[in-house]
From Swiss-Prot:
Facilitates the ubiquitin-independent proteasomal degradation of stimulus-induced transcription factors such as FOSB, EGR1, NR4A1, and IRF4 to the proteasome for degradation. Promotes also the degradation of other substrates such as CBX4. Plays a role in inhibiting the activity of glucokinase GCK and both glucose-induced and basal insulin secretion. Residues 263-282 have a biased composition (Polar residues). Induction: Down-regulated at high glucose levels of 10 and 25 mmol/liter glucose with highest expression at low glucose levels of 3 mmol/liter. It comes from the Eukaryota. SMART domains: UBQ. Pfam families: ubiquitin (PF00240). This is Midnolin. CDD domains: Ubl_midnolin (cd01804). GO terms for biological process: negative regulation of glucokinase activity; negative regulation of insulin secretion; proteasomal ubiquitin-independent protein catabolic process. InterPro entries: Midnolin, Ubiquitin-like_dom, Ubiquitin-like_domsf. Its main location: nucleus. Interacts with GCK; the interaction occurs preferentially at low glucose levels. Interacts with the proteasome.
Length: 505
């Protein structure tokens, strides 16, 4: 009997008759080595299991090269690896694969790019399962968390081992959701690059997650875990937007929730005049009712689900900060009500932020307004978004809807912002009018200098007076010529000291 390929013959002495049996070797379990050659001449040696799929190999290369897997194409003996297992294409140990980058050409849907960018950034993270012990960012019995989030669109040098761009073996999703390290994501928003850094912190409010955006200037301190950089304050003195458009935040654990369709949000900076559309495919939370504090009147009607932006500050062109709150979707929570430690939770957090931006109205506040907002806000974050009466308010806010529609003294209302914009526009228009007037005067001076007759300003004034006073005079005076007959119309520009014969000559 010939030995079977891929197997080895082993005989057991205890078997009756000295029978031998075939035992499969561990060759199938051993990893196989692949040589990845790129079109630029770079070579990578990669070890993958024998049952590795094409999608898994592309994901490994995406994490190693920091390139979206949709932009990678693999060739094996002039055959493109599309889907399925590597063995189906004849790939074995020591096989050579060619890595070809995918070039986009033609028209593409602009709405699909941000969604792919978010998913590409999240899929490049490592998702090692965390230990069973709760992390420092775990709140007691709640699916809500507080985040310090740094958002800016300027290219910056990432530092520290927390950046997912540095790849590696660290479980980035687990470390972020357990509060051990911040998470940095590089997102493509149209023609811009947007960097988002999130830091998980404990929140005492049950079933609530609060996102606190810190200044981009404090990025280095935030990466070290300095919690004094962010200002985790709620916004009882600053309305987010109109009462009919702000989505609610349910503070009741028993409120039913249901998924909602995909919504798109925009980051808009009036100072930098840049708009960043974003769209993700994670369903934002939905709540059918809104709870308020005892003694307050119920809301007239339920509003659309989603997060609420409490404050928004523009620190520099392209650098934004603020706070917003929302509810984790039940699909992002485990049986104990804690957030699941996977990319779906992070995607839902980003979707809350991006969905809430289109409901926010008004110009980003300055740092001085942020200090005013901090004085009007309570010392500790409120567990819910129901406004509370402070010294900066003139009127009481009995409900959430009424509180958000009231005009606060800390933040300038929309009319004041529009007045400021109108004043700046008027200044620009007046300056343009002044420049045009100066240009007209210079052009008139050049035209008068090229004319055949040089009229003095006094003679021009005399002509205008004679033309205006042509009532009882002769018809010739009424014509308005206003010629001064005491002086000749034309004077020779010669020196009077010269003798007459030279003048005639």
């Amino acid at each position: 009997m010939e030995p079977q390929p891929g197997g080895a013959r082993s005989c057991r002495r205890g078997a009756p008759g000295g029978a031998c049996e075939l035992s499969t070797t561990a060759e199938s379990a051993a990893p196989m080595s692949l040589a990845i050659h790129s079109t630029t001449g770079t070579r990578y040696d990669l070890s993958v299991p024998h049952d590795e799929t094409v999608e898994g190999l592309r994901k490994r290369l995406s994490q190693r090269l920091k390139v979206p897997k949709e932009r990678l194409a693999l060739l094996h003996k002039d055959t493109r690896l599309s889907s399925g297992k590597l063995q189906e294409f004849g790939v074995g140990d020591g096989s050579k694969l060619t890595l070809v980058p995918t070039v986009e050409a033609g028209l593409m849907s602009q709405a699909s790019r941000p969604e792919q960018s978010v998913m590409q950034a999240l899929e490049s993270l490592t998702e090692t399962q965390p230990p069973a012990t709760p992390g420092p960012g775990r709140a007691a019995g709640g699916g809500f968390r507080k985040y310090r989030l740094i958002l800016f669109k300027r290219p910056w040098h990432r530092q520290g081992p927390q950046s997912p761009e540095r790849g590696g073996e660290r479980p980035q999703v687990s470390d972020f959701l357990s509060g051990r390290s911040p998470l940095t994501l590089a997102l493509r928003v149209g023609d811009h690059m947007m960097f988002v850094q999130l830091q998980l912190a404990a929140q005492h409010a049950p079933l609530q997650h609060r996102h606190v955006l810190a200044a981009a200037a404090a990025a280095a301190a935030a990466a070290r875990g300095d919690s004094s950089i962010a200002t985790p304050v709620s916004s009882p003195c600053r309305p987010v937007s109109s009462a009919a458009r702000v989505p609610p935040v349910s503070s009741s654990p028993s409120s039913p929730v249901s998924p909602s369709p995909v919504t798109a949000g925009t980051f808009q900076s009036h100072a930098a005049s840049t708009t960043c559309p974003e769209q993700t495919d994670c369903s934002p939370p939905a709540s059918s009712n809104t709870t308020s504090t005892p003694g307050s009147s119920p809301t007239p009607r339920s509003r659309k689900p989603g997060a609420v932006i409490e404050s928004f500050v523009n620190h520099a062109p392209g650098v934004f900060s603020g706070t917003f709150s929302g509810t984790l979707h039940p699909n992002c929570q485990d049986s104990s009500g804690r957030p699941r430690r996977d990319i779906g939770t992070i995607l839902q957090i980003l979707n809350d932020l991006l969905s809430a931006t289109r409901h926010y109205q008004g110009m980003p506040a300055s740092l001085t307004q942020l200090r005013c907002h901090a004085q009007c806000s309570p010392a500790s974050p409120a567990p819910d978004l129901t406004p509370k009466t402070t010294s900066c308010e003139k009127l009481a806010t009995p409900s959430l809807l009424q509180g958000q529609s009231q005009i606060r003294m800390c933040k300038p209302p929309g009319d004041r912002l529009r007045q400021t914009e109108n004043r700046a526009t008027r200044c620009k228009v007046e300056r343009l009018q002044l420049l045009l007037q100066q240009k007209r005067l210079r052009r008139k001076a050049r035209r008068d200098a090229r004319g055949p007759y040089h009229w003095t300003p006094s003679r021009k004034a005399g002509r205008s007076d004679s033309s205006s006073s042509g009532g009882g005079g002769s018809p010739s005076e009424a014509t308005g010529l206003g010629l001064d007959f005491e002086d000749s119309v034309w004077k020779p520009e010669v020196n009077p000291d010269i003798q007459s014969e030279f003048v005639v000559a």
